[in-house]
Amino acid sequence: MNTIHVDVVSAEESIFSGEARFVALPGEAGELGIYPRHTPLITRIKPGSVRIELPDGNEEFVFVAGGILEVQPDCVTVLSDTAIRGRDLDDQKAQEAKAAAEEALKNAKSEIDLARAQSELAVMAAQIAALRKFRQKR
């Protein structure tokens, strides 16, 4: 069976390291699907869900708040400031953070504050969407 080694790393820790049959994640130009022996690639990724299909057919989900993807024929590396295992996502915390980002958006006093609030809101919306996707798969 052909597999590819996958590493998902946050600023604090390694979130996932193992073999996979397939990886799907949100690239800047759209959804990316990666199989073993994929053409080398480096690109930015958007906030969203990384879906890792394991050799036994099970799936692992990881939320990433954007980052960098490096693909080699036998290895996929996802680097993200924030990466959370699907099973560790907390709906209440995500909803609270989204509400705080919406409030910050309303109260933004400068272009920088506005951009920061918009970015945080986009990340939290993506995290909530990833949480829903994870729950549907369970």
Swiss-Prot record:
GO terms for molecular function: ATP binding; proton-transporting ATP synthase activity, rotational mechanism. It is a peripheral membrane protein. It comes from the Bacteria. GO terms for cellular component: plasma membrane; proton-transporting ATP synthase complex. InterPro entries: ATP_F1_dsu/esu_C_sf, ATP_synth_F1_dsu/esu, ATP_synth_F1_dsu/esu_N, ATP_synth_F1_esu_C, ATPsynth_dsu/esu_N. The keyword Nucleotide-binding does not apply. It is found in: Cell inner membrane. Keywords: ATP synthesis, Cell inner membrane, Cell membrane, CF(1), Hydrogen ion transport, Ion transport, Membrane, Transport. Produces ATP from ADP in the presence of a proton gradient across the membrane. F-type ATPases have 2 components, CF(1) - the catalytic core - and CF(0) - the membrane proton channel. CF(1) has five subunits: alpha(3), beta(3), gamma(1), delta(1), epsilon(1). CF(0) has three main subunits: a, b and c. NCBIfam families: ATP_synt_epsi, PRK00571.1-4. Belongs to the ATPase epsilon chain family. This is ATP synthase epsilon chain. The gene is atpC.
